[in-house]
Amino acid sequence: MMKPETSAMEQTSSEILEKAIAFGNNGINLIGRMFIPVNASKHNRVPAAVLCHGYGSDQAIFEDSARELAAEGIATLTFDFRGHGSSEGELDGSIVDDVMDAWDYLHDQPEVDHKRMGLIGHSMGAFSAILAAGKLRKAKVLVALACPGEINNPIAVNPRHIFHPALKWGITMIFKIVQRTHKLEVRVNWKKFIAFWPKMKPSRALADLDNCSKLFVFCLGDPAAPYNKFLYSYGMASEPKRVMVYTGNHDTPLEEGMLRSQWQKWTVGALHGRHPY
């Protein structure tokens, strides 16, 4: 177990304190950042949320949202997944552990109200956040932005086929083409990463999250995470739940505009105990 590290707290606005952090319980040092409302303390605990970026991205993609949520009284934590940004290691089959490590770090902060914590993720980060929520069974709020659907193809999910050379090569090439096309900098253990996806079932996790308010956000022009591919998982999700489908592309939920404003407003209401539906 690594000893968590933090930098000195700095006040970046009249409303928010920020600090760089490092944490990790699984032999991988993860780099992140916390955004804390200035009025938060152990005597005035506030809601909190972990924000999880997508494949090939890093924590910077969520910093605007993290600051805006902190300005609304919610402590936030962003971080780089293993194999991404400044964090150590390679992207493999343990990304859910990264989310849970981030959750534990945030949970341990004296300013945080443990009963009002949430997970927010985009793309791969949304997929991982759902799986982590299923393991933790403690999240009050779950926000999944542009989440890929699970793999239900009987050939792909059969353990005998996962490492079939042709299947493994095909899936690997798809990720590599995306990585090169968009100039993504990711350190990947392909064997472990490719084996991870078919075995993970967000629908099972979502079915058991009865006490968690869930929001799913999709864009009609998103070929990476088409909303119709997530319908099975959404159908399996327990209430309370809501879906937003807007025009846009894979990254539109992260960009300044109406959609980002809407899901952030929903999150603020849910974590502050105001009915968001």
Where are these predicted regions, by residue range?
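Catalytic nucleophile-loop/oxyanion-hole region of alpha/beta-hydrolase
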Residues: 82-114
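Conserved alpha/beta-hydrolase
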Residues: 66-86
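N-terminal cap/lid segment of alpha/beta-hydrolase-fold proteins
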Residues: 2-44
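Hydrolase active-site cap/lid region
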Residues: 134-191, 213
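Short beta-strand element of the alpha/beta-hydrolase
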Residues: 44-54
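Serine-hydrolase catalytic core
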Residues: 183-272
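Alpha/beta-hydrolase fold nucleophile elbow
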Residues: 111-123
